[in-house]
Amino acid sequence: NMFKENDITTYGIDNFANVTAKDITVTNLYVDFKVKITDRNERIKVGIPGRFSVYNSLAAICVAKKLGISPEVIKEALLEVRVPGRSELVDNKMELPIMIDYAHSPESLQNILQAVKSYTRGKVISVFGCGGDRDSGKRPIMGEISGRIADFTIITSDNPRTEDPQKIVDQIEEGIKKTKGNYKVVVDRVEAIKEAMKMATKRDLIVLAGKGHEPYQEINGKKYPYDERIIVKEIIG
């Protein structure tokens, strides 16, 4: 009743709504789905994989419709949209699915790994560390989460700051040992990414978690230039 005076648009996937996504395809590179915009069904493709991406796209479509934006412009915009460091796929010559995500808490790591696990046909390879001079209690928890969900985990550094990087990875390792998860420890993050890329195929998905959009890595209290997108491209050459 509180909304009856207002012009409300609902959107959804499973439940009845004004704007509904149907015939959804989720791959490790994109999602696509059908949705009615104005008076006809349109096929929408979004270069951010995951079911959550469908919901976000539907919300954007609802707003764009209210603003009178044409279906053609909506389709083009959703195809091109990228959010730096959030489920961001890195284009590369090897055509390996490599995703950069800012996940740096137990909850966010669990969310991204579960999301990619649901649609990846091959292995999910998780590469992550934990920040230094921050809550050390979450380190074994994140190790346990990755060990439970990912097919293979490479424990590495994030921003060690003033802490010993080895001590941080040891604490993460305590958690992963509670699981049956396959893993290895590679303290140097660039070397860890190289290891992940060596073992991956085009069916797999590598999740580089924690750094996201940050352009630096902080070691011994000093910030060094570090952009994960550039690192991936430099490794491939």
Show which residues each predicted segment covers.
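Acidic-glycine-rich active-site phosphate/pyrophosphate-binding loop
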Residues: I24-R43
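A residue-level signal for beta-strand positions that form part of recognition/binding surfaces
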Residues: N18
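A short glycine-threonine-serine/GTX helix/turn-capping micro-motif
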Residues: R43-R51
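ATP-dependent carboxylate-amine ligase
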Residues: M2-D7, L29, T38-D39, P49, ...
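Short beta-strand elements of ligand-binding domains
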Residues: T9-D14
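A short catalytic or substrate-binding loop motif that flags glycine-/basic-rich loops and adjacent residues
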Residues: N15, T25-T27, V81
